[in-house]
C-alpha cells in the first residue's frame, strides 16, 4: 500500500482501543483511557469489572466506554448475558460487544440466538456489536448469523474474539457483501499493523478493535509527516 493511500484514511476515529488482558491493572485502564482521549479513538474496550473506572476516566470526553459481554465463549445463558449487559450500562458503558451462542447457532436454535441479542439491544438502549467468531462458521452459518443480528437490532457485526484465530480480509469482504451496508463491521483479532488495518477498512470494516493502536499511530504519523514528532514511547505495554 502506498503512503498516499495510508494518509487518506482518518484512522483514529475508527479504533476501539482494546484492553482485554485479564492481568491488566487499573493503571493500564487509566493509561488506555488517557491515550484514547488524546487521540480521539472511538472507544476504550475493557472488561466489565473495569467499566466504572474507565467511565470515571473518560467523564465528559468524546471517547465511548465499551465492554465485552459473554466473552469469550458466548456459552452463558441469555439471562446471564442480559444481566451482565445491564450492569455494565449502569456502570457507564455505552457500547457492548456481545458474544453470540455458537452452539445454538450451529444446532439451528435461531430464535434463541435472535432473542438473546434483541433483548440486550432493547433493554440496554446502547450500541451493541454482536461477536460472530467468523473463523468457526460455515458460509451458511455466517449468512444466517448476520441476518439474525441485523433483525435483532445490533449496530455492528464483530468478526471474532481472537480465541479462534485472527480476522482476514476475505472475511471482511464477505461481511460487506452479506450486510449490504445495513450494519457496521468491526474487524478484530490479530490486527497489529497499520497497513493491515487500512486494508481492512478499505475492504469494508468501519471499526478496528486492537490493542496496538499507539504503534499504528506512530506508523501513520511517520507516513503522513516523516519529520514531525511522533507519539511518545514511554508507555506500559500489556
Tell me the role of every PLM-derived stretch:
Residues 40-42, 61-65, 92-94, 124-128, ...:
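Short, well-ordered coil/turn segments that N-cap beta-strands
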Residues 55, 76-87, 137-148, 173-177, ...:
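Catalytic cores of alpha/beta
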Residues 33, 37-53, 69-73, 96-114, ...:
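Glycine-rich, proline-tolerant flexible connector loops at the mouths of alpha/beta enzymes
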Residues 1-34, 173-185, 191-238:
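Alpha/beta catalytic cores of nucleotide-metabolism and tRNA/nucleoside-modifying enzymes
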Residues 48, 52-73, 110-136, 166-193, ...:
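Alpha-helix-loop-beta-strand connector modules within alpha/beta enzyme cores
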